[in-house]
Amino acid sequence: MFASLTSEQKLLLKKYKFNNYVKTIELSQAQLAHWRSNKDIQPKPLDRAEILRVEKATRGQSKNELWTLLRLDRNTASASSNSSGNMLQRPALLFGNAQESHVKETNGIMLDHMREIIESKIMSAVVETVLDCGMFFSPLGLHAASPDAYFSLADGTWIPVEIKCPYNYRDTTVEQMRVELGNGNRKYRVKHTALLVNKKGTPQFEMVKTDAHYKQMQRQMYVMNAPMGFYVVKFKQNLVVVSVPRDETFCNKELSTENNAYVAFAVENSNCARYQCADKRRLSFKTHSCNHNYSGQEIDAMVDRGIYLDYGHLKCAYCDFSSDSRETCDSVLKREHTNCKSFNLKHKNFDNPTYFDYVKRLQSLLKSHHFRNDAKTLAYFGYYLTHTGTLKTFCCGSQNSSPTKHDHLNDCVYYLEIK
């Protein structure tokens, strides 16, 4: 599986596959306080170097397996379906992809013109033109964009280029298209594009803000934090290039949407960590007593299985299991948990079952100034702080003085599940 991926791409897939990435999201108290007062996450989790690392590893786009895999479930600028089953679109898609490459490779004058526009508007020199563009992540990592090309400026700015090659205009020039427009209006929409053009005189093009292509470009500018972009449409013998300014209102809405989603994932992850303590899971049934009819014995059975109650939804603190609290206890307990790390093991198999709960291990480690900075990682790997101030695993009883090395017995069931 994933045979075409390099070792670097496999690392990126493991880290940034959407379902993996969102489970790592957490907020510090400072970040949470900043979000509450400013509705913005600072600092952002992804820096420029990491964003470019992903972009370079996903070049080739649809020909690159990593690009396809990272798009799954992620909010992309095109907002298109991840799987296209419409066979009627295939000729148009194949034509468009081939023509986009041709446009980039054979139109140096167009690119020179774009550079002149950029440098006159932004007052910063273009230092690199990337024609084989991969996928850009936003600094929060939830949204992504894959323009057809981009310019990199001396001041660090990125400018996206989106190229459209409508199949319908493969044999139609701009003037032929204008002739076919009506006569009652001064301007007309150009079908299959986001363009608006005047009927008479020298053609003057502008973008329609309600069109999907306009929104796609604005999402690209949001993800890349670009002040502008270029929208290119190919006709038979013509290229139409429109410079598109950043729509701050649109981008602010995108920012708000992504910030809220990021916080929601962080809260969900925080809940999962909190509910890895059995007492917290049991308390959840008491807190939400109006949302269930389970007996005390049934609650104990579900708590032992790692389940807690969250506003009418039964969830597992160790995996993605979810169920409605109206479901019977027997039915809930019979359902399978996929990739669950609760293991449902008997405590007698552990060296010190008192520290089976992650939270208890974490609390013990936080008492040590020496291990405090690595407490979360150590607790995850099963370590707790003994009364003598040393590290020991609750599962197989291994002791270790180095917080960066995780030594468990070869047959340790807990470590075999989490490593």
Curated annotation (Swiss-Prot):
It is an enzyme of class 3 (hydrolase). GO terms for molecular function: endonuclease activity; exonuclease activity. Pfam families: Viral_alk_exo. InterPro entries: NF-kappa-B_Signaling_Reg, PDDEXK-like_dom_sf, Restrct_endonuc-II-like, Viral_alk_exo. One of its GO terms (cellular component) is host cell nucleus. Keywords: Endonuclease, Exonuclease, Host nucleus, Hydrolase, Late protein, Nuclease. It is found in: Host nucleus. Its EC number is 3.1.-.-. Its main location: host cell. Belongs to the baculo-herpesviridae alkaline nuclease family. Interacts with LEF-3. PANTHER family: EXONUCLEASE, PHAGE-TYPE/RECB, C-TERMINAL DOMAIN-CONTAINING PROTEIN, YQAJ VIRAL RECOMBINASE DOMAIN-CONTAINING PROTEIN. May play a role in maturation and encapsidation of viral replicated genome, by promoting DNA homologous recombination. Exhibits endonuclease and 5'->3' exonuclease activities. The endonuclease activity displays a specificity for ssDNA in vitro. This is Alkaline nuclease. It comes from Autographa californica nuclear polyhedrosis virus (AcMNPV). The lineage of its organism: Viruses, Viruses incertae sedis, Naldaviricetes, Lefavirales, Baculoviridae. The gene is AN.
